[in-house]
Amino acid sequence: MADSTGLQFTVKVGALPESTFVVAEFALDEGLNRPFNLRLELASRQPDIDFGAVLDQPCELLVWYNGELQRRVCGVVSDMAQGDSGFRRTRYQLLVLPALWRLSLRQNSRIFQAQKPDEILSILLQEHGITDYAFALKNEHAKREYCVQYRETDLDFVNRLAAEEGMFYFHEFEAGKHRIVFADDAAALTQGPELFFNLGNRSLEQGPYVRQFHYREAVRPSDVELKDYSFKTPAYGLSHKKQGADLDHQRDTYQHFDFPGRYKQGGSGKAFAQHRLDALRNDAVAGSGKSNCAALQPGQTFSLTEHPNGGLNTDWQVVRIQHTGLQPQALEEEGGSGPTVYHNEFGVVKASSTWRARIGSPEALHKPMVDGPQIAMVVGPEGEEIYCDEHGRVKLQFPWDRYGSSNDQSSCWVRVSQGWAGGQYGMMAIPRIGHEVIVSFLEGDPDQPIVTGRTYHATNRPPYELPANKARTVLRTETHQGEGFNELRFEDQAGQEEIYIHGQKDLNVLIENNAVWHIKHDEHRDIDNERVTRIKANDHLTVEGEKRDQIKADYSLTVDASLHQKLGQSLLVEAGQEVHIKVGDKLVLEAGSEITLKGGGSFVKVDPSGIKLMGPAIKLNAGGSAGSGSGWGGKAPVVPKGVEVVKAPELVELVKAIPTEKAMEALLKEQGPAQTFFVPSR
């Protein structure tokens, strides 16, 4: 029942009868971008209320004036305490929070991919059973290619993500329920009451009023410039600048510059720069005050009238407010005397300005940083062994990602550090599916992983057993979709030093100029099939010992010009059947002392003493014909296969970064006569 002031506070908790509790006192703290906090001091004739009927149950506080509802607050009981018991009443303290508070009870690490911010927020809310929420968004918010919640509560992640996207949220209340509303522009605020400024002792009967209003202006950063880098557009500076408004009462040289800006697209960069500026200046023009209007709450505006300073008679939006209500008669004889009273203290900004949470404030904590490198597993589609994109990026499965499915959807494309990376030159070794890799994070940002190393583990063992082969340095690959390997191995054990090369199939070598080999001991070659060699100029061979050739089939030698042979001692030729020499013009056999032709028991001998012919008969012009040989039947050599000539990389003009003059503008404006600042020429 209301007292003489007309004020009354009532409460309904869970399924308990409305008469179970009476309100002795309440304190309600509300603000943009944070859950409200309602503390209730209650009294009950029951000294043994079941905590299970109260905790985690809905609770609703109603503020009445002359029988008319002025304000409703609905939430969930998160904390309950039983206090003193008197002759008739037992005191209870309840802490009531919105359903959004439940998100603070779960800490998680997970990855969202190719989803808009409002989609991510919806997923988190629905996972906690919150379906009464709305988005009042004026601006377009781009999909996030890769967004990580890392070792933070769901609530902290929601607050941070909303702040990064320039969103703020507030609560709306209806009978028995409350709604979370996400907005990104002041246009989403609802129009609240008109409140006059009470200079005297006008009562609530004349309407709600503001009894104290303080106005304040503060010097804040004047403009924001954010910069980032994308490997897809390395020459593009990704720098975006936004200038603040309402700078009449301060200098315009207080620039806030930050890198990285946490964006990869120009459109997002422009929006993020504006969001950062709005957040940094969210209290540049502000007000605070006290009123008796219980309807005031974040997410709405009110009009101030009748203030002596006419400039303050305008529309304001509530960004924070603390309500206090006392109803001492609820305690009956155990309470103090006095009327039921209510008042609030509020903080406001201009209704036309969009308030945004400042990253690093209680409303939006800083993004968690990854303390150091992590281990991850390379993953990809089923049936694949190597999975990458045109940039050599791979997909990863982190041990902490409980929602990942260890396939091509497990992460974003992650860049891989190589030992050398130039314009179409350098090194390239793609981590394969199943490999364990070391992952670092640029600026410690969980949204920007990069593979910086590879490691073996109990399943993926080194190519050779250790420590038995600790002196070996090995580069061994594995045949893709087959069996076998290629290998380059260095053995550094003293007395066993060796360079070993194994090719599973072909070896192709292309040397653009000279190849020089110096082998200080033996060279052994064993070719299981053919050897084909072509020398387009001269071939020089010097053998300082002996040379032995064994050919088990035919030997064909074709010389297009002359064949010169010089022997220091003897030329000894033995043919199993026939020696046939055919000369197109003349044949000269010259010997210093003797020439002998022998065949069939006859011979011709020419020496200094004369010519001797010996045979059963010597015939001159006796007819018959000369014997004939088999003739030349040699084969031409096969032309060797060529080596594919890889096209030389095109010349790439190196982009030299030039410092922007924007960063110097503020200094140049403040330059004194004796000061000199250097601005690099373009």
Swiss-Prot record:
Pfam families reported for this sequence: Gp5_trimer_C, Phage_base_V, Phage_GPD
Knockout-associated phenotype: Deletion negatively influences motility and biofilm formation.
Entries under InterPro entries matching the protein: Gp5/Vgr_OB, Gp5_Vgr_C, T6SS_RhsGE_Vgr_subset, T6SS_Vgr_RhsGE, T6SS_VgrG/RHS, Vgr_OB-fold_dom_sf
The family this protein is said to belong to: Belongs to the VgrG protein family.
NCBIfam families documented for this protein: vgr_GE, VI_Rhs_Vgr
PANTHER family: PTHR32305, TYPE VI SECRETION SYSTEM SPIKE PROTEIN VGRG3
Job description of the protein: Part of the type VI secretion system specialized secretion system, which delivers several virulence factors in both prokaryotic and eukaryotic cells during infection. Plays an essential role in bacterial mobility and biofilm formation.
Protein name: Type VI secretion system spike protein VgrG3
Native source species: Aeromonas hydrophila
Gene coding for it: vgrG3
